[in-house]
Amino acid sequence: MTNPLYKKHVISISDLTRPDMELVVATAQRLKAEPDTRLLKDKLIASCFFEASTRTRLSFETAVQRLGGNIIGFADGGNTSAKKGETLADSIKIIGSYSDAVVMRHPKEGAARLASEFSRVPVINGGDGSNQHPTQTLLDLFSIHETQGKLDGLNVAFVGDLKYGRTVHSLAQALSLFNCRFFFISPDALAMPDYICEELEEKGIRFSVHETMEEVMPELDILYMTRVQKERFDETEYKHMAAKFVLELATLEGAKPTMKILHPLPRVDEIDVAVDKTPYAYYFQQAENGVYARQALLALVLNETV
């Protein structure tokens, strides 16, 4: 079978089709069960993080090394020639000449797409501002499939910051290809953007808006939590909003035994630590799955057959 991701840039989740996503999930599942240390043998990946990152950068570097590849790069754009005024286009041209693929995070929206236009090797977006974070979506899809055994027809709630959270935008767009039903739970000021809702309506995807988690809890297969960003509100308003969207043990009353809680992390106060010990909590395993999803994507982008 032809590998459709071979030598492909992955900048946005919309760059991938449903079969592409299913291929990444299946490959991640296989690599988690049967590690293969040869898939990136003799491959050199450039890890270019112009913006600080913990989980994304370390999981990519772990993924490369566990597949037998080598990695070069930087974790702080302030220590590169960008500080001297070098353009991103020039930087990527040079970095691409040293490597087989570039993994990049950048604070500016659209930076990854720009980089792909000047790179002779595949560029994988590790996050560009509040725009896109496709590999987070892929690890979310893998985690959902791992816990539910499928992606089709699930009931998924998104809670918290639905306006600025790039993870919820991308995941909603991806899951819309699998005919899932969505429940949006957020402060009015942080509601899901109109363009996402309009896109879902055009596709015939069912979604509804709610004020509390409790009113939909019994229906859910996946509860996707996000943090309300403190910096976007004054102290009084933040405390009011944040307190309204905290997941506690009592909130979980009536949940399906198979329901799982996901969170892109970092967690602040929106999930009580007591929830960590319940069988519903899956956010730490979700973060671990980032290694396998990124292994799968790198292997597919850099190998004609996997």
Swiss-Prot record:
<dbReference type="InterPro" id="IPR006130">
    <property type="entry name" value="Asp/Orn_carbamoylTrfase"/>
</dbReference>
<feature type="binding site">
    <location>
        <position position="56"/>
    </location>
    <ligand>
        <name>carbamoyl phosphate</name>
    </ligand>
</feature>
<dbReference type="InterPro" id="IPR036901">
    <property type="entry name" value="Asp/Orn_carbamoylTrfase_sf"/>
</dbReference>
<dbReference type="Pfam" id="PF00185">
    <property type="entry name" value="OTCace"/>
</dbReference>
<feature type="binding site">
    <location>
        <position position="266"/>
    </location>
    <ligand>
        <name>carbamoyl phosphate</name>
    </ligand>
</feature>
<feature type="binding site">
    <location>
        <position position="227"/>
    </location>
    <ligand>
        <name>L-aspartate</name>
    </ligand>
</feature>
<dbReference type="GO" id="GO:0005829">
    <property type="term" value="C:cytosol"/>
</dbReference>
<comment type="pathway">
    <text>Pyrimidine metabolism; UMP biosynthesis via de novo pathway; (S)-dihydroorotate from bicarbonate: step 2/3.</text>
</comment>
<dbReference type="InterPro" id="IPR002082">
    <property type="entry name" value="Asp_carbamoyltransf"/>
</dbReference>
<dbReference type="GO" id="GO:0006520">
    <property type="term" value="P:amino acid metabolic process"/>
</dbReference>
<comment type="subunit">
    <text>Heterododecamer (2C3:3R2) of six catalytic PyrB chains organized as two trimers (C3), and six regulatory PyrI chains organized as three dimers (R2).</text>
</comment>
<keyword id="KW-0808">Transferase</keyword>
<feature type="binding site">
    <location>
        <position position="136"/>
    </location>
    <ligand>
        <name>carbamoyl phosphate</name>
    </ligand>
</feature>
<protein>
    <recommendedName>
        <fullName>Aspartate carbamoyltransferase catalytic subunit</fullName>
        <ecNumber>2.1.3.2</ecNumber>
    </recommendedName>
</protein>
<dbReference type="InterPro" id="IPR006131">
    <property type="entry name" value="Asp_carbamoyltransf_Asp/Orn-bd"/>
</dbReference>
<comment type="similarity">
    <text>Belongs to the aspartate/ornithine carbamoyltransferase superfamily. ATCase family.</text>
</comment>
<keyword id="KW-0665">Pyrimidine biosynthesis</keyword>
<comment type="function">
    <text>Catalyzes the condensation of carbamoyl phosphate and aspartate to form carbamoyl aspartate and inorganic phosphate, the committed step in the de novo pyrimidine nucleotide biosynthesis pathway.</text>
</comment>
<feature type="binding site">
    <location>
        <position position="166"/>
    </location>
    <ligand>
        <name>L-aspartate</name>
    </ligand>
</feature>
<dbReference type="GO" id="GO:0004070">
    <property type="term" value="F:aspartate carbamoyltransferase activity"/>
</dbReference>
<feature type="binding site">
    <location>
        <position position="133"/>
    </location>
    <ligand>
        <name>carbamoyl phosphate</name>
    </ligand>
</feature>
<dbReference type="InterPro" id="IPR006132">
    <property type="entry name" value="Asp/Orn_carbamoyltranf_P-bd"/>
</dbReference>
<dbReference type="GO" id="GO:0016597">
    <property type="term" value="F:amino acid binding"/>
</dbReference>
<feature type="binding site">
    <location>
        <position position="105"/>
    </location>
    <ligand>
        <name>carbamoyl phosphate</name>
    </ligand>
</feature>
<feature type="binding site">
    <location>
        <position position="265"/>
    </location>
    <ligand>
        <name>carbamoyl phosphate</name>
    </ligand>
</feature>
<dbReference type="GO" id="GO:0006207">
    <property type="term" value="P:'de novo' pyrimidine nucleobase biosynthetic process"/>
</dbReference>
<dbReference type="GO" id="GO:0044205">
    <property type="term" value="P:'de novo' UMP biosynthetic process"/>
</dbReference>
<dbReference type="Pfam" id="PF02729">
    <property type="entry name" value="OTCace_N"/>
</dbReference>
<feature type="binding site">
    <location>
        <position position="55"/>
    </location>
    <ligand>
        <name>carbamoyl phosphate</name>
    </ligand>
</feature>
<feature type="binding site">
    <location>
        <position position="84"/>
    </location>
    <ligand>
        <name>L-aspartate</name>
    </ligand>
</feature>
